[in-house]
Structures are given as C-alpha cells and as structure tokens.
Amino acid sequence: MSGHSKWANIKHRKAAADAKKGKLFSQLSKEIIIAAKHGGGNPETNPRLRAAIERAREANMPKENIEKAIMRGTGEIPGVAYEEVTYEGYGPGGVAIMVEVVTDNKNRTAAEIRRIFTKHGGNLGEAGCVAWIFEEKGSIIIEKESVKDEDQLISDALEAGAEDVQISDDTVEVITSPESFSEVRDILKEKGYKITQAEVTKVPKNLVPVDGPDAEKVLKLMEELEDHDDVQKTYANFDIPDEILQSLS
C-alpha cells in the first residue's frame, strides 16, 4: 500500500495547483455529469453522485455549478456528450498504469494519451492488460494537523470499519473497502478529523521498485497524464525511494 500512498500524497499536493488552473472544478463537474447520467440526479439514491457532490463541496465548488452539472447529466439542460474511457499500459521499469478519462472525442484522446506514454518511454496496451493488478478501495486523506492522537485515530478508523491506516509526514490515509467507504468517512468527519480528500480509488496489489533514471521518467509520465484536460484519475504500482520521490516531485 505504501506506493499507492506516496502517489496519493503527490497528487494531494498538486491539488492546489490544479485548482488554480481551473482543472479541479472541470474534473469535478465531469464526474457529477457522468454520475447523474448513469444513476440519476438524486444523490440519495445515487451513491456515486453523492460522493461526487461531497468532493465538489470539499473543494468549495459553487452550488450553482454543482446543480448545473447534475442537470447536464440528467439532460435537463443541454451540454457536451461525455463518455468514460479507461486506458491501460506500462511505464518505464515495467510500472503498470491505468488512466481514467472523460472525453467528448475518444479518437482524439486515445491518440494524445498514446503520445504521452511513448514520449516518456512507456507504451499503451490493450484493455485489461493491467487492470488485474489493481483492486478498488476507499481512500480517505486526513490533514495530519487535525490528528491530536495517532493511536486514537487508528482506533477510531478501525472501529468504524477501515481496513488500514497509512501515516506519512504530512498526511494520513485511511483505507476502506468500497462498501464501507461512505460510513467510515462520515464517522471520521463526525469525530472532528479534517478530511481533505475522499474517494473510491484503485490500489495496486503488488508494487514494482523503480530507481534512477526510470523513476524520473515514470514521474514525468504520470505528471503529464495528470495534466491532460480529459484525465480524471491515474493509478500506478511504482515504489520509488522516498529520497528520490522528494527530489523529483
């Protein structure tokens, strides 16, 4: 789980920059549109929409933007016809990578994602080539300053139904099953922990050690994928030493 936590922390630090560029709101809006399109506009009966709205609120997305995104998803107001696509491939050092996108032009996006992989020494593969390496888990990122007692947090999280707790220098990640994710998140929030990010994500079952030049190439590949306008989420199974990770990120 450590490799996942490292990448989760890097992405968490990038969130402020993404917000400044406006990409964060665009990502959140697309997720709400897709969730409403497939499950309806009522968050009480659509767990995916409820989670997307929670993320949007945590990012201080205006209420009007959220409501418009829901209506675009349900077709109440006109909007771009988006669809979800997942791309899979390998990066330098044999790192498995999954990329989830929301696009209005699959052909354009596929060509651009392939170019990014190739540019950084990776290759885009067929559907299913790396999906088996990952499993769905709930990920709850907590601001470490809001944690007064780490042992108490671990106890609270496990009692709420969490599977694991990963503690790093500046954040804490609580791992749950997809089924218990919402309940654990709500309980921890009620107990006063400051949750900065919460989502159902994909966690690698095994990690690939990456060092030296390959580590730099992998991070540049991941960062360019993250910066692409159509990309919603990225997942990878690299394990890069902390000292290299800090110097490159």
Swiss-Prot record:
Entry's family note: Belongs to the TACO1 family.
Residue stretches in coiled coil: none
Chief site of localization: cytoplasm
Keywords of the record: Cytoplasm, DNA-binding, Transcription, Transcription regulation
Compartments in which it is found: Cytoplasm
Protein name, UniProt field: Probable transcriptional regulatory protein Dtur_1615
GO annotation terms (biological process): regulation of DNA-templated transcription
Membrane-spanning residues: none
Short name of any one Pfam family annotated for the protein: TACO1_YebC_N
PANTHER family: TRANSCRIPTIONAL REGULATORY PROTEIN YEBC-RELATED, TRANSLATIONAL ACTIVATOR OF CYTOCHROME C OXIDASE 1
HAMAP family per the UniProt record, alphabetical: Transcrip_reg_TACO1 (MF_00693)
GO MF terms held by the record: DNA binding
Gene3D superfamilies tied to this protein: 1.10.10.200, 3.30.70.980
NCBIfam families: PRK00110.1, PRK12378.1, YebC/PmpR family DNA-binding transcriptional regulator
GO cellular component: cytosol
